[in-house]
Design a protein with these regions (language model features):
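Membrane-integral, polyisoprenol-dependent glycosyltransferases
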Residues: 1-158
Length: 158
């Protein structure tokens, strides 16, 4: 993936990367700001992940987009891992390829925004809910709650 091959260009990419940059410069990892003004449009999780990435790999487009690329890759893998025992290797591979090659999945994997992470947590919640319906257990249900909570920390009810 060529994550750093073009500048941050979308309004969302600018807002997310700007708020993350300000988070790193002012040291406030609880409240987000952009140009000194509060930015409470989105919950905090994606900013933390971008801050980790930028701290580890430098202040580049690639580093801001890395959390989205990793979340999209995990999303495809999770769908494949869920489909494989139910459909077989070849159909599960086809499902993963179709997801991977869809413009939506490809697009959000390349943007510094919260969408890929939210899709990963939604997929995990739905998959664990399905597993709960297959074989009810409190553990499966708790995992559904965890994925939903992480989804709320990603995109939230804000």
């Amino acid at each position: 993936m060529n994550l750093g091959g073009w500048p941050l260009f979308d309004v969302d990419e600018g807002a997310f990367s700007g708020a993350t940059t300000e988070m790193l410069s002012n040291g406030n990892f609880i409240s987000t700001f952009i140009y000194g003004a509060p930015r409470f449009d989105k919950p905090i999780l994606i900013y933390w992940l971008q801050a980790l990435s930028v701290t580890a790999f430098g202040h580049t487009e690639w580093a801001f987009r890395l959390p989205s690329a990793l979340a999209s890759s995990l999303w495809v893998w999770v769908v494949f891992a869920f489909a494989r025992p139910r459909l077989g290797n070849a159909p599960a591979s086809l499902v993963a390829a179709m997801l991977c090659l869809s413009i939506a999945c490809w697009g959000i994997a390349h943007f510094a925004s919260a969408d890929a992470l939210l899709n990963l947590f939604l997929a995990l919640a739905f998959i664990d809910m399905y597993r709960y319906w297959e074989q009810p257990s409190a553990r499966q249900l708790r995992r559904v709650y965890v994925w939903i909570a992480l989804g709320l920390l990603t995109k939230g009810p804000v």
